[in-house]
Structures are given as structure tokens and as C-alpha cells.
Amino acid sequence: LTHQNNSQNSVPKVMVIFPAKNEEGTIENSITTARQSYYKPDVILVDAFSTDKTIQLAEKAGAIVIQQPIKIFPAKGLAMRAGLREAFDRSADIIVFLDADIRNLTPEWVDKLVKALIDDNCDMSRGFYTRHARDAAVTKLIARPMLHTFFPELSHFEQPLSGEVCARRQVWENLLNRENGSSSTPDGWGIDVWFLIEAAISGYHVKEIFMGTKEHTSFEDYREDVSKLSKMAEQVEFTIIREAIKYDRLEMQKKVNV
């Protein structure tokens, strides 16, 4: 990965955010690796009341550690919003989200996501990857089929639930400001697909970036028992349905043969 020559003043202020709960096995290496990016990002850990050594290891690795505002789980949406507010307060120009359980993270993941915004002039970059055949069950069985039905313009996205997402501060601010009444930002697992749908509806150019292979510890928890993903599946499903109602897309289901 090559970069154009930039003066110190022209390099954007990048911040990387890891939402995490009980990720002591990977978090220290993940933070250390992210900080090695060409863009020298500051790192924020949003902790969901971990009971292991996640917080201590994150602080040791040099991260800014904040607490998820409410003690509920799953609450990825809450964590992402808290991380964004912290990044806004610290004057970030570009904000990157990464999953905290990745075993094979490299600095180039951050580089690729940020570089897409700078060089390719897209508004949001999202990672996609080669994954184990039994991985990404919610993506394959819920997210992609439902997007194909209600938001066919998004059906080409390989990983609509990607945890590796990057956008400029103004994009994140605008997306958060779109929430209203019955369509507030999801608190849980629906947040990833919500950001994708809202970004696309807003007219932003969203681009997927190939990151190679993804190896993550959460897959080990559900590879033999996919029912452990039921709460995630439920939240993703209802988020897409709610978005379909909001944007008058329910009629699209009539095109599906049943």
C-alpha cells in the first residue's frame, strides 16, 4: 500500500474505535496494531462493562478508555454512539470502527479504509473479507436476503454487517442527526446495517474494500451452535424492517416468490 507524500499538516487526524466486551485475548494486540497505521491514529476503546482484563490491557496498549453509558448487552449501537461522541470531542477528522476480536488484524486494514476516503473520494468505506464457510450466518440468511428484497440497490454489498467501517466526521454527524422518533439509531446489533442503509439513502458514496481473510474469536463461539446468533439475527431483521417501513419499501416484498 503506497501513500502520496503529505506534509504533516495535511495528514488527517484519524481515530480508531473498538467497541468491546471481555476481549482480553485480542484487544492489546488489536490496539497496538491499529496504532501502527500510516495515519498514526489515536485509539478509543468503548468498554461494555468487561469483567476480564480488557480495560487494563487497553490502557497498557495506549488506548483512551471510556465506558458504555448504560449497562445492557448487546449494545453495540450505544457503544458506537459513545465512541463517536468521544472522537468528536477530540476533533477527529476521520473515524474508523474495528471489531475488537480480530486475530489477524494488520495496520494495513486501517490504511486501506482511510485511503479509500482520501484517494477514491468515497464517503464511507467498509471492509469485506474471505471468511470460513460457516461464518457470517446472519449476513447470509438475514441481512443480504432482506436487503435484496427491501433495498435492492444495496444487494451487491458482500458484508452489510461489517464491523470495519470508516467515514469522515461530518458523515458520521449527519447520519446520527437523521435519527428521529420511531427510527432512532439502534442500540444493539442493528447499528451496522442501519448505518449502511442511512448512508445510502442520504446519497453518500459507500465503497467496500477487500481486506483479505478475517479470523475472529467470536466465530469460535457459534460455529457449532448457530442459535447463539439468534439475538443478533432478530435485531438485524427488525432494523431492516423498520427502515423498510420508514422509507416505504414494504411493497417491495410483493416481488418475492413465496
Name the predicted role of every residue range:
Residues 2-151, 166-177, 187-202, 206-209, ...:
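Structured catalytic core of nucleotide-sugar glycosyltransferases
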